[in-house]
Amino acid sequence: MRFLRFLKIFFTVIRFGLDEMMLSRVNDRRVRLLLRITTIGRKFDAPPGVRLRLALESLGPIFVKFGQVLSTRRDLLPVDIADELAKLQDQVPPFESAVAIRLVENALGAPVDVLFDDFERVPVASASIAQVHFATVKAGQHAGKAVAVKVLRPNMLPVIDSDLALLRDIAVWAERLWADGKRLKPREVVAEFDKYLHDELDLMREAANGSQLRRNFAGLDLLLVPEMYWEFCTPTVLVMERMVGVPISQVETLRAAGVDIPKLAREGVEIFFTQVFRDGFFHADMHPGNIQVSLDPAHFGRYIALDFGIIGALSDFDKNYLAQNFLAFFKRDYHRVATLHLESGWVPPTTRVEELESAIRAVCEPYFDRALKDISLGQVLMRLFSTSRRFNVEIQPQLVLLQKTMLNVEGLGRSLDPELDLWKTAKPYLERWMNEQIGLRGWYERLKIEAPQWSKTLPQLPRLIHHALAERHDNKRGANDDMIRQILLEQKRTNRLLQGLLLFGVAVGVGAVLARAFLALAYGG
């Protein structure tokens, strides 16, 4: 089976001339001679990117998804190929309704007619991983609720594992033979794709992502996220509240319904930056099919988010890196942008900051001939990632996912309102986040988080030091030196914390006394 699949891949490569694309960059002279022989009599009119896209489409949904993931790696691929791969559509015919019903019944342990009323046999959506049916809950606490039932395609895992094994083999050979193999890191790209696919195969994980996003936006009149009905959720079946809206791409329909389109564009950007800089947790598959607008009078004009299989997460370090980069960029402080890249640890330490600064200036300076509203933050990130190739910068997967999502958000926003000033909308979020992190409030919040742990550690330090010294004396192990250094470092950190707490307490006390004295003088008390 695997051999037959390999043969199909081989003949597809020959058919679309991908061997010419790949082998032309191989260093081995014998391979280049073989290329000259195999290309005799073959002529390809279509550009390389188009041929690659057509080849992936002919190999089936797993390779289509691989191409979609590759399209986000603009730090690795030429722009023309990345743009062409972005056109790949994850659309496949639905599987039989009888199979879907059997899968639901096996997963939930009861007949569909017992669980649901009006289970629609024809799916409303179908993709390579799953398809969706509408239904109504029959009994229990959610009786009468209209729901969407997402069902994982049957026998997906063996197919995926087989294709992934072949992709891993191809990646090994590409890295060994291709001139760009080491820089493009094909094995790492395949490993990233492996994780991405297996995450999508777990619908419980998707339900948890949706539940988290719903909780994050509770109380805000910005985004509607369906409720997950956990009693009906398993790794292969997901049941959630049914939300019906108009796809965001149908602008004329929305305008005719009375939706405020410029306001919708601004709120879309606001939703994105709230996810990124407030929550560090963002919907990373924001194409028009997954983003709709409610026309329900109770939630008129509000966004609806669907499909939570791909979610990005950012650490405080990532958010700080992004915020400072964007702020430095708009101040045209390229030295700061270069320094941030070096401080991140993702640039080789031998890199000269002046050389990196010069390259970043060459990328960014042309943008300032335009109005701020015409500057694409996603394009800025993309150009910076492209520059990173020259300096062997290690781009983090979560930032690549963010850049792809940012391009989607900008595209959606400007399709709604061509005059949308993304920077004007984003800047308050960046500045607010920086103030919260660097100011007194940020210091106090971190203090509250760390203080309990340090208060537990402090009383144990004398015993730990005594134990480490005794063990060192007995065993004379060099490894204990590291332990002692770590303990002493922890003690220094704890001392700094206690000093900070003391100073903070004194400052608060003095402030209270001065405030009381001022009030007494002011009011004669």
UniProtKB/Swiss-Prot annotation:
It is a single-pass membrane protein. One of its GO terms (molecular function) is protein kinase activity. InterPro entries: ABC1_dom (IPR004147), Kinase-like_dom_sf (IPR011009), UbiB (IPR010232), UbiB_bact (IPR045308), UbiB_kinase (IPR050154). Its main location: membrane. Pfam families: ABC1. GO terms for biological process: regulation of ubiquinone biosynthetic process; ubiquinone biosynthetic process. Pathway: Cofactor biosynthesis; ubiquinone biosynthesis [regulation]. Is probably a protein kinase regulator of UbiI activity which is involved in aerobic coenzyme Q (ubiquinone) biosynthesis. This is Probable protein kinase UbiB.
